[in-house]
Amino acid sequence: MANIKSQQKRILTNERRRLRNKSVKSSLHTAVRGFRAAVEAGDKDKAGELLASTSRKLDKAASKGVIHKNQAANRKSALAKALQKI
C-alpha cells in the first residue's frame, strides 16, 4: 500500500475506473456477440436493430474514454460491413 495520501486516493479511483471499464467492455462484448449471432442466422431485421444499439454502446464507450474513438469507428465499420453481406 502506498504511503503518500494522494497515491492512496489514486489507488481507490483506479480500482473504481477499472471496474467500470470492465463492465462497459463486457456489455460491448455481449452486444457484438448478439449481433454476430443474428448475422450468422441470416436475420437482417434483428441484425439491423442490434447494429444500432451496438453502435450506440460503442460511441458511448468511446466518449467515456473506455475505448479509443478510432477503435469504436473501426468496430462499427466492421459490423456494418457484416450486415451488408447478408
UniProtKB/Swiss-Prot annotation:
One of its GO terms (cellular component) is cytosol. Keywords: Ribonucleoprotein, Ribosomal protein, RNA-binding, rRNA-binding. GO terms for biological process: translation. Signal peptide: none annotated. It comes from the Bacteria. The keyword NADP does not apply. GO terms for molecular function: small ribosomal subunit rRNA binding; structural constituent of ribosome. Coiled coil: none annotated. Transmembrane segments: none annotated. PANTHER family: 30S RIBOSOMAL PROTEIN S20 (PTHR33398), SMALL RIBOSOMAL SUBUNIT PROTEIN BS20C (PTHR33398:SF1). HAMAP family: Ribosomal_bS20. Binds directly to 16S ribosomal RNA. Belongs to the bacterial ribosomal protein bS20 family. This is Small ribosomal subunit protein bS20. The lineage of its organism: Bacteria, Bacillati, Actinomycetota, Actinomycetes, Mycobacteriales.
